[in-house]
UniProtKB/Swiss-Prot annotation:
GO terms for cellular component: cytoplasm. The gene is hisE. NCBIfam families: histidine_hisI, PRK00400.1-3. Pathway: Amino-acid biosynthesis; L-histidine biosynthesis; L-histidine from 5-phospho-alpha-D-ribose 1-diphosphate: step 2/9. It comes from Stutzerimonas stutzeri (strain A1501). This is Phosphoribosyl-ATP pyrophosphatase.
Length: 110
């Protein structure tokens, strides 16, 4: 895992027990999962809008900024649910070299 993801995962874990007024992440944890999920949704929309703007303008700076926000809040969500970023990287590794059609066909039917 990248050093950045490792450091971020450590910070997110450390903030779980912190006072809500000590950091933004601690305040999100204190507000609960619904607030965290709301932020993930908000950042998803902002990322989509930034992608549309980048396609028109050719300037990807807002896209990169909003994608970083989306990834960050997704990592907060994972941490709040007791998951580590490595689990996502492991899943991506598992899929590497696997056709998207084959992966989809192998999913359990619901």
């Amino acid at each position: 895992m990248s050093d950045t993801l490792t450091r971020l995962a450590e910070v997110l874990e450390a903030r779980k027990g912190a006072a809500p007024d000590s950091s933004y992440v601690a305040s999100l944890y204190h507000k609960g999962l619904n607030k965290i999920l709301e932020k993930v949704g908000e950042e998803s929309v902002e990322t989509i809008l930034a992608a549309k703007d980048a396609a028109v303008s050719g300037d990807s700076s807002d896209l990169i900024y909003e994608t970083a926000d989306l990834w960050f809040h997704s990592l907060v969500m994972l941490a709040a649910l007791g998951q580590h970023p490595q689990a996502v990287l492991d899943e991506l590794d598992r899929r590497f070299g696997l056709s998207g059609h084959a992966e989809k066909a192998a999913r359990p039917q619901t």
